[in-house]
Amino acid sequence: MEAATADGFRPRFWGGVNLGSTTPGHLPGEVAATRADYNRWIWEMGRLGVSTVRVYTILRPSFYDALRAYDLGHPDRPIRLIQGVWIPEDEWLSTGDAYAPAVTNGFKAEIADAVGVVHGSTDLPERPGHASGSYRSNVAPWLLAWSIGVEWDQKAVKSTDRLEAGRPAFRGRYFTSAEGSTPMESWIASMLDYTASLEAGRGWSMPLTFTNWLTTDPLAHPYEPLHREDAVSIDAMHIAATQAWPGGFFASYHAYPYYPDFLRRTPRYANAADPYSVYLRDLRRHHRGQAVMITEFGVPTGIGVAHRGPLGRDQGAHTELEAGSMDADMLRDIRRDGYAGGMLFEWLDEWFKFTWNTWDLEQPAERRALWRNALTTEEQFGLIAADTRGQAASGGRVIAGADAGVQEVRASHDEDYLYLRLRFDRPGSWRSSPVTVGFDVRPGENRGLPGTRGADPAADVALRIGSGDSAQLLQAAWTDPIAWQYGIARRFVPMHRAHLEQGSGVWDSPRLILNRPTLIRPEHRVYPTELVDVGTFP
């Protein structure tokens, strides 16, 4: 992709980052970031050499004010903008038809608002879940591209194609869809055409794209175990810009190395030295003659994990250094394999996010944004970590006095963790004489802490510190959510009913489920449930 410079148009690889709409402690619709936040973040992006920032929706005026101020002050290395526009997803999912007036008209209104925002020529009234204010900062000179849409829901795509079957291909002034295009593809072409018409009316033309992801990619994946992850396709090769739109059109994808499962079950990928790169080359080959950008990629940090990926590129359980190294490797893959750019997900941790294997236990869901769950991987993608840095750990109140070599126990907490400070008679004594701390979290007993003769029978969670520098978190077996959710309810994991009796006296280590049993049809093979221990700390 090329961008205008003082010397004319110049092609380059665009390395950038995605920026969300809010800050920890807030839901996305609250768009809580301030001008000071944006000033700091954009300056830090510039220091890192970020060439592009992608946003998903309209942000507060202060974002565009900060971006324009930075770019005016750095004409030799401005940060370009990819502006996203969300589809009215609730209306689309409820109607199952992108052509429904509530969806199409609502999306056009969002696009029109976004165009006015980018050109600094609109005022948006207050509306729940949306940014508002007076937009007077024109950032159009630094607009690299428009990216409209969302990660398309498979069922709603399939429903749209069924309900609108027989629709002719779209023929607009600026964008068209090919003969044989699906109704969903033609609808996307019409929305791109509408976006282009608004920009053309202002005398502008720039690259346009729509959001896509591996679930609706145009390739066939017979080794994908979940039918819904390969049920429908949306193919950017069926959409084209006309000569009336010199800004052009490109394909874009959210592409992660750990999901869907075809990335590690397809022999062509699984047996390769770098499965992610082989997939990227297959996808790039399909889009021959068309520019393609990876607009989301990355791996999260934290102690939780939600899915396994080839080469250890799992969805979680990485240190900051490990994640950074993997992200850098993938960015090199993206560049080497002929893509126009790669946008890392994401700039800042987002606490409101959820992960499939923990969200049932994060109750009430509307309070998820108020605290950080170390086991929820979607909260840990940020290039900038949004954590409390353990400041509360240094204080706390005394909750237990002298006992068995421990002088006192202090407890404190913050939005991240519960902190315990144990003061020992002999510093480091736990390395040779392990200490067990019990917690009474819920009603009921479990016959005493593990490794004791009935000490603290009310405890249902135990933390064993030592020997050495290891630690082990244990839970009463009858409180194990995995056993109840995936053993009793679904029979995905083995379990002993006697252990699940309240007060059974059995202890086990907390686990997360990473995959349910999966059938790979070409192999006629069922892969068993995948679990990971999250209670052992070496």
Where in this protein do the model-derived segments appear?
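Active-site-adjacent substrate/metal-binding segments within catalytic domains
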Residues: M1-L72
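Short, acidic/polar
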Residues: L27-M45, L226-T242, L321-D333
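Acidic-and-aromatic substrate-binding clefts and catalytic sites of carbohydrate-active enzymes
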Residues: A32, R54-D65, T215-L219, P225, ...
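Glycoside hydrolase catalytic-domain groove-lining segments
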Residues: G203, H221-L311
